[in-house]
Regions:
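Conserved class I S-adenosyl-L-methionine
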Residues: 1-45, 150
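Class I SAM-dependent methyltransferase SAM/SAH-binding core
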Residues: 49-53, 57-100
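A short acidic, Gly/Pro-enriched loop at the edge of an enzyme's catalytic core
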Residues: 99-111
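A short SAM/SAH-binding and catalytic strip from SAM-dependent methyltransferases
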Residues: 109-124
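A short glycine-rich, Lys/Arg-flanked "PGG" loop and its adjoining helix->strand segment in the class I
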Residues: 126-138
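Conserved beta-strand signature within the Rossmann-like core of class I S-adenosyl-L-methionine
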Residues: 139-146
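Short, glycine-/aromatic-enriched active-site segment of Class I SAM-dependent methyltransferases
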Residues: 148-166
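Short alpha-helix
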Residues: 167-179
Length: 179
């Protein structure tokens, strides 16, 4: 595990409980995100499960599950997995690094990767996307959400807890070229 991945994991482990409490119901206030997820569900059709990659406390997995979709969640942070399972006991969650997922080839019908790639260094984005492609079933659908721009924002403190997190912004044209 490289330092950037390790720092991301440690940082989210530190803030998992607070993050879960603050964001567990965020989908209620995000009609655009819900619409994107509904389109993912329709496009995936009978292909399942759909994975909430970088699931955090599982708010996206919960929304997908509420739409009648077989859903699972994967996150780098063990403490986030604990929170996700606590908040959503009916959904399966497991730990995984999107640069080296523990899941078998062709095992997911769809992926909702909402704002998780923002912690992947630019030079590793293609590797993460290849790994996502590896676990997608033929005809599977990938939905990626990210911040638009070129900057990298850094956070040393989050809710009075020490963290070491970079948030990378990407241009749609560069993301399209990687896909």
């Amino acid at each position: 595990m490289n330092k950037a991945v390790q720092d991301t994991q440690t940082s989210y482990d530190r803030v998992a409980v607070e993050y879960g409490e603050r964001f567990k119901d965020e989908m209620d206030d995000k009609p655009f995100d819900r619409d994107c997820l509904n389109r993912l569900v329709r496009a995936a059709g009978e292909l399942d499960p759909i994975c909430d990659l970088g699931c955090g406390p599982g708010q996206i997995a919960r929304y997908l599950h509420s739409q009648g979709v077989k859903t699972l969640g994967v996150d780098l942070s063990a403490n986030m997995i604990v929170e996700a399972q606590r908040l959503n006991p009916e959904i399966h969650f497991h730990q995984g690094d999107m640069l080296s997922l523990p899941d078998a080839d062709n095992s997911w019908g769809g992926i909702a990767a909402f704002y998780c790639i923002i912690h992947i260094p630019r030079e590793q984005i293609v590797n993460a996307l290849r790994e996502m492609k590896r676990v997608l079933k033929p005809g599977g659908i990938l939905l990626v959400a990210f911040h638009i721009g070129t900057e990298i924002k850094h956070l040393d403190d989050w809710w009075e807890k020490p963290v070491n997190l970079d948030f990378a912004f990407y241009l749609p044209t560069e993301m399209a070229s990687w896909l």
